[in-house]
Amino acid sequence: MSRKIDIIVANPAGNTTIFVLTPVPVEEYGEITESLLKIDFGKDFGVRFTCPDSESVMGEQVGFILPESEGELPGINMSGLEFCGNASRAFAYYQAACLGKGTPLEGGVETLSIRTSGCSHPLTARIDAKANFAEIQMPLPVNITKFSGEELGLAHENPNLIDCFLIDMDGISHLILDNITASLEKFAKLRKHVYEKCGSLDAFGVMFIDRESDFLTPVVYVRDVNTTYFEGSCASGTAAAAFVRGMEKYDGEYSFTFRQPAGTLYTTIKKESGQIAEISLSGLLELSDVISIEL
């Protein structure tokens, strides 16, 4: 059975996200996601972004915008009901810049709160539409699991990799690895090992970080839609990496910049009484016009 839906394509720091504007039942998320991820929006619909500048624009993930009831915050479900920081800040940008739902602050900045799958509380965003920039409060980790490099079979590649941390961001868990080369084969082995120890996670990522350059290569698996991607950038993984860096710091405010395959993300953490109290994440983004598609 065919259906017509309206979508927009978002480019939050290269983590290309398709937003479905038409209300869709949750049980249809998987089928629609599978269809949308096959479409080249650059070649078929003329979508073009400045960074990365490519004639091909393929989605990496799909978010479904929820119908709003009176008094409710704007909301979004990711296709696997996971959490995604890049999708969340792009959704907040769409709500403020395109629908006028933000509250004005000084200097042309707007703020609003949203709700999202994989996070049990609202998140607050700051939007600068003229600068194509959005910052969002990130959820704090709900659990931390420590592995050794030897336990993960990585000691031969990096003998200095003593402690590795799996950071559970509630809707997605990320393994943070320094100075380990990324590959799908390695990712599959790491996922198998982590799942054997921690159970089957809804969504799992490995953040492969070159410690000298702070270049981060994100690989993410979402169980319910069975997708694995080398992502252009990963916001929740970047926040998890910043959290691990913050574990090494004294109380204070610290900023970290992580370059990624298709964009750069910026994080700020605040540490108080030996605990990380806040994480925010920001970066550039772009949106396409509304596109109507027959599936």
Q: What are these model-predicted stretches?
A:
Residues 136-140, 145, 149-151, 165, ...:
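Intrinsically disordered, low-complexity regions enriched in acidic/Ser/Thr/Pro/Gln residues
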Residues 131-135:
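Long, low-complexity, Lys/Arg-enriched
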Residues 153-170:
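Short, cationic low-complexity segments
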Residues 1-130, 143, 166-168, 173-295:
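A glycine-rich beta-to-alpha transition motif near the start of alpha/beta enzyme domains, typified by
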